[in-house]
Amino acid sequence: MTEQKIQNEIILAIYQRGHRLFRANAGKVITKDNRVIKLLPKGFPDTFGFRKTDGKFIAIEVKTETGRLRPEQIKFQTFAETQNILYGVARSPQDAIDIIENGAIYHE
């Protein structure tokens, strides 16, 4: 299964449980008229949002079963683990649910 398909399934599963999760775009985009638009920083997780029960910030990196974190993603992971947020690497909707509802921490 592709990362995009897993991500879509995760977002749907999380919405169905009442939490909110949004797709994140990192890096930069060059428009047709050659303007550069900076998005989120490199390494920012694939999805972010908030938990319905307390509004706690969620950041979830989505990977396939064999996917590995890039150096920029490892840097964000190291930072996230020092913050009072919900962060993890999810390879399935159940992983994401566990991160959000049970405080599970998944690494690569």
Q: What are the roles of these predicted feature ranges?
A:
Residues 1-108:
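Catalytic phosphate/metal-binding cores of nucleic-acid and nucleotide-processing enzymes, i.e., regions
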